[in-house]
Amino acid sequence: MLNTILTGEPSDRPPLLIVHGLFGSARNWGVIARRIGTDRQVISVDMRNHGDSHWTESHDYFGMAEDLAEVLEHHGRADVLGHSMGGKASMVLALTRPDLVRRLIVADIAPVGYGHDQLDNIRKMKQVDLEKIASRAEATEMMGDLEAATAAFFLQSLDLQEKRWKLNLDVLERDMETILGFPEVEGRFDGPALFLSGAKSSYVTPAHHAAVEALFPEAVMEEIAGAGHWLHAEKPREVEAAVRGFIEG
């Protein structure tokens, strides 16, 4: 089963499952998990090939959805919040196992393919000589021209003591086209769904609304003012309020 971080105690309210994005980990949503975990249990997962979860030979959305289903079969039906890659995995979970999902929140992603890729970032991480580095500052220098915030985000997945990335970079690189795409899935999710996007992000636009509504007919679209793709890091209070309002509604 996926590595999980549990925040808060089980209560009469449904648990909230939080699913991070590409190159992330369960800890990325820690601030929001702790705040929402005051009155319900929050289950944050490390996705396959990330963090302290198992490595696999494939990184596709049906496999990721099966991983999430295994977690919820253990913890019970839940509200599910997924960001970016985790949002796509959460959508596939809701479409294939609607019995496990009470309410769905998708953060800044749509059920469509995207043209950009993250291969250059993988190459930068692979430039780090793991045998030689003694500090994160040295790793940052080896990665070359990266924004400070991006480098800091990647370094959360660097285990200096074990001299390894907690990311299966080879598989993520090989399956990047699959990660950027969205699989053909039969059926639809008729439960409540909130598609939360950053107003400054280009990941979800009005052109994507038809694709969302075809699979999630009850979807509500909401923007977080002033936020980009990393809306939970940029506007945590606003994201928390939107999530809380939706799951308590």
Predicted regions and their residues:
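Active-site loop/oxyanion-hole signature of alpha/beta-hydrolase fold enzymes
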Residues: 5, 11, 30-38, 43-81, ...
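Active-site glycine-rich loops that stabilize anionic/oxyanionic intermediates
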Residues: 21-24, 84
